[in-house]
């Protein structure tokens, strides 16, 4: 579908791959001015990397997506968190009782279809390792990471972790963020520029989901992390409530 060049984006989860045609494809979950998944091509120029908008897919009314995981053939998975008009009271009840609120969907042949067996509480970050046929799904309100074999349509493993958000895979390790608190612990922290409530970064073995390392923090200049990305012996972190990117040394 077409867009007005003056439209304002409200981006959420993203994924970047090199597709079957040899292009770098970026998918972006977008919430404004309508629910959509935006597609971009990333190209290298002489002095920088540029983004070219290639189109978007309108999201049906029954879905409210958080994150996306691209396949090399152009299809993709997306995490449907919960209904769009969820109230704060309903959201808190889901968090407390871990109620089923959403699932993963697969977009293929211009259709969205539910992936059976992926129901859970607050599906959030997702990551596809297409080479192994494994789909990793974080259930933010359900406090767990689940792994699914997309070829056999089976769940192969899970890992308990509080309020996980996005997932990053590198060098045979899975990196996750954890909020070491409950939903009613926020108090007035959400009103501050940076909220330094306790959190942890978990490093797991990709095959076994055994924890390889854990880094815990409290009362720092950074908080409420959403992603942990290792690079050059540092772990870089994004946040859903901060005016900065944080990092720490893995040592």
Describe the predicted segments one by one:
Residues 224-251:
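Blade-level signature of beta-propeller repeat domains, shared across WD40, Kelch, NHL, RCC1
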Residues 2-18, 53, 58-76, 82, ...:
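Beta-rich, blade/repeat-based domains predominating
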Residues 34-40, 101, 144-146, 186, ...:
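Structural motif
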Residues 42-46, 107-111, 149-153, 205-209, ...:
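Short loop/turn segments that connect beta-strands within beta-propeller blades
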Residues 161-215:
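Loop/turn-rich, solvent-exposed surfaces of beta-rich toroidal or solenoidal domains
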């Amino acid at each position: 579908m077409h867009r007005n060049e003056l439209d304002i984006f409200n981006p959420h989860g993203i994924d970047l791959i090199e597709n079957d045609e040899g292009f770098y494809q970026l998918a972006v979950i977008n919430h404004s001015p309508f629910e959509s998944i935006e597609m971009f091509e990333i190209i290298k120029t002489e002095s920088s990397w540029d983004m070219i908008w290639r189109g978007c897919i309108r999201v049906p009314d029954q879905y409210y997506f958080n994150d996306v995981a691209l396949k090399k053939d152009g299809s993709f998975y997306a995490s449907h968190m919960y209904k769009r008009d969820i109230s704060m009271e309903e959201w808190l009840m889901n968090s407390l009782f871990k109620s089923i609120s959403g699932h993963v969907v697969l977009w293929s042949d211009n259709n969205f279809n539910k992936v059976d067996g992926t129901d859970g509480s607050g599906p959030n970050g997702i990551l596809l390792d297409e080479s192994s046929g494994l789909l990793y799904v974080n259930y933010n309100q359900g406090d767990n990471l689940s792994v699914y074999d997309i070829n056999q349509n089976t769940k192969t493993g899970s890992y308990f972790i509080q309020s996980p958000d996005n997932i990053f895979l590198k060098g045979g390790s899975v990196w996750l963020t954890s909020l070491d608190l409950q939903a009613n612990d926020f108090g007035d922290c959400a009103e501050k520029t940076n909220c330094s409530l306790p959190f942890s970064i978990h490093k797991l073995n990709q095959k076994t989901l055994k924890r390889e390392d854990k880094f815990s923090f409290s009362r720092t200049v950074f908080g409420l992390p959403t992603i942990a990305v290792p690079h050059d012996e540092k772990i870089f972190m994004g946040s859903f409530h901060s005016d900065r990117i944080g990092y720490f040394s893995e040592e």
